[in-house]
Amino acid sequence: MKAELIAVGTEILTGQIVNTNAQFLSEKMAELGIDVYFQTAVGDNEERLLSVIDIASQRSDLVILCGGLGPTDDDLTKQTLAKYLGKALVFDEQAGQKLDAFFAHRKQAARTPNNQRQAQLIEGSIALQNQTGLAVGGLITVDRVTYVVLPGPPSELKPMVKNELVPLLSASHASLYSRVLRFFGIGESQLVTALEDLIKHQTDPTIAPYAKTGEVTLRLSTKADNQALADERLNRLEAQLLSIRTVDNQPLRRLLYGYGEDNSLARETFELLKRSGKTITAAESLTAGLFQAQLTDFAGASQVFNGGFITYSIEEKARMLGIPLGELQRHGVVSSFTAEQMAAQARCLTNSDIGIGLTGVAGPEALEGQPAGTVFIGLATKNKVESLKVVIGGRSRLDVRYIAALYAFNMVRKTLLKSENLL
């Protein structure tokens, strides 16, 4: 099945907004086994939109239009598609009731006749209800081409696609099953080199690498009749690729940290801390609280985290953590000594099981003779204090700080796994 995406809105063409909907929709279509062959952006102009719809209908089986469902005169997507299909617009009662409820609770908002446009639907369409907005979407098939209209705001489009559109399309198309593997400690080029033969000769299942900031993911995908058959194929491919070694002779299995599109090193570490009943603290310099902020993104963070420290200057490291100022000056702020002392003192002061210390040079200038990107991470438990030095070269200040936090999470993750004899 060939799909085409049409983004409607002059603001896209003028660069005022980025069309993130195209990426989201392409991913969702791929999960359904639907191939997106074309993506188009067109302004709020009926003549040009009619032309784009006509071209799409001649070469695609599924045409998805995003945007232009609002109440103003330049919101003309449904009106233009209805004109192209020779269909009338009808009023959707459920969407109309939502309009009534919205304005009933907002006396200060004046309802105008134009608002009725948001509850209109092309005659013969299946309504796609809007859980987070007012404009109803729709799906209609005419002459073997299926047309879908969706709202433009991602906060409205995404729930509509997940909860309304995907179930409809899933019922009529073969499914694509995917599994996302997440790796840390290896770059995309190194990973692709290690998997060169597998990628070169892939058919089904397929392997798709994606570079993220500081990490790499692999999406394994297969088209199958059911989940059990898909799992069998994906398990076989996963076992094969995880047994492969990198150019420096590391098994890829050791670099895999988790699964899932929305997973992260922070989440994996948080779950391990919860499972083991351990608590953690951190004293941060160059990351300025980033490690602690990511850790507390998850509900239940208070079970594993009581508090921590941001000690940016050398004086605050001495004052807040009780590290002798003379020792800090002698060893330098950017050093294994300082990272280890930060971790150990933070652990003792908060009575935590694990302490992390982060210090380094975010850049762009060097510090204490250390180049930008030099990071020392200390880790303290009741039994040991250790540190790791990493050099995150060629990155922005923001990336250095973010990747430094990733290394810290990975250090904690590996420590917890070793304590459970799982690494």
Swiss-Prot record:
- Gene3D superfamilies reported in the protein's UniProt record: 3.30.70.2860, CinA-like (3.90.950.20), MoaB/Mog-like domain (3.40.980.10)
CDD domains, per this entry? Answer: cinA
Xref: Pfam families: CinA, CinA_KH, MoCF_biosynth
Top-level lineage group: Bacteria
InterPro entries reported in the protein's UniProt record:
CinA, CinA-like_C, CinA_C, CinA_KH, Competence-induced_CinA, MoaB/Mog-like_dom_sf, MoaB/Mog_dom
Family per UniProt? Answer: Belongs to the CinA family.
Specify the protein name: Putative competence-damage inducible protein
Annotated source species: Streptococcus equi subsp. equi (strain 4047)
